[in-house]
């Protein structure tokens, strides 16, 4: 776990509202924005919260410092603390920095390899209007992180605070941009030689051989590379600071003599990895130069257009003033007309400048120069396999952990339908409904709200990538859900885990037995080799199409037995329900146009008033019995539940501190009573899961009256019939 302050280089550019917009922007990605939380604010929507905080900041007119504090809390790859833990960590860190009573907005992000929280804090106290600047925040954050890791069982990180700001920035450059910094290059290439120098002459010689120069700057020394990049000597090593060097060699002596032959020199280029990125980096530099030329040309065009429009507006204003001067009106009338002309000119100039600023911003965003890692990410999103391999070869990349799926065979390239994002470490995030599947090249992971569709998509992707032999790692609950998804999807896979494979086969057998067709007399038909064939299989079904062709509606199975193409049908000869008559099931053609006689003509009086809203008649011969909660719900009950869930989810996305809501389906686990609601005269019961998610279950009014005896937080369970039951054993 790492917590760090992200300072603004320019105080004038600091803006609380813009920071909140950035951290709460989904950017068109499903797997980016998680829970958004607002603390110590009276407003209920994000725009109102931003206005409230900005008003508080404007109340302090004395301070000229940055009034916004941007805090970033990041967790190790694979760590997924629950919502309650994240809230507790945020509260304790903010309190440790002295911001417990300050206004703040936080957002959880899932679009990288590391779960992280952005926290935008107002440094102005909401009631005292005083500014608070944490003293030695880096030390306080290091101590807080160490304590929180111990209290919540998180993986330990190195919280050494001896690194300087410049060294941290160099590390960030290498980690995020993927480009070698001057500090890192000197440490890797020539630091031992510099430390072994015995005099100023030896030191200058080593520097010249490596394309560096030693210069005095202020009270210390700097190293300067051939491209003008500089770094403090003490940042590279404390042994190279000015006091240490003068204590060893005496007073500083500048370099003398001409240029010496260089063995190597620093150039900003990608960090060395296990694959060669020379061609990719050449493409990157070429596109970067082209983008710079395009940007310069478009900005020049916008600038010339703005100047022409301004000149035209000024010329029009001069003509207007000249016309006013020639008028024979009085002084007061002319003064009013001059004022109107000036006001019109100001409006025109403001419009021209506003359009110019908007156009310039659009050009800058479209032609923005990307860092090396960002360019690789963009190319990988376009389908460049070489760029994706370069991302996955970066140093510090870790494998996916937790609930994962992988294969024993060699990984083959494969892509799902929708790619939501690709991280800077080469992890592809595929969008699957409300969940997502992560792919690091070696294994797959279903992340965030692992739905049945997400598990099924992960298994199918694993089959495409690794073959039919799959290895599943994770919790027992995850393995059980994987086995259920494999059985429900009839996937032709085999699990390496013998127990899991037996469970899959058991579930598959139950699924097949459950779907075996039944006879009209209630007994199951038996079929297969050596058994009694069903009557439907012994009878030849012929259907006549529109052209008179006769088609056999039977199919021969691999074992030689006759199998119906249409499962779950009743006994042959039984008249199908009305909505199933004259359908095209298993028929090539069907004549549907005929001339009806006069006695069969449909007249207006024969058409019921609700003809456009007629529903399907029940066809119980083709249906299986429905069991479990939700059975027999009326359409208005379902509509009311869905309306309430949609309304609460929209408020949650708008920044309200509201837990996730969903309709109750077939959840099995601990639940607690969270109250009742009435929507469109329909009663809804609210049930809280262990992760604070609220499940909405429609109930009747009699059940609502009985539920009034319950208190908020009482444990309840949902019976298969859809009623509520407390731990005391009394049905509610």
Curated annotation (Swiss-Prot):
Domain of life: Bacteria
Keywords: Conjugation, Plasmid
InterPro entries documented for this protein: Endonuclease_MobA/VirD2, LPD7, TraI-like_C, TraI/MobA_relaxases, TraI_M
Pfam families, alphabetized: LPD7 (PF18821), Relaxase (PF03432), TraI-like_C (PF22287), TraI_middle (PF22863)
Compositionally biased region (Basic and acidic residues): 508-528
Region (Disordered): 508-553
The protein's role, per its UniProt record: The initiation process of transfer DNA synthesis requires the interaction of at least three plasmid-specific components (TraH, I, and J) at the transfer origin resulting in the assembly of a specialised nucleoprotein complex - the relaxosome. Site- and strand-specific cleavage at the transfer origin is dependent on TraI and TraJ.
Protein name according to UniProt: Protein TraI
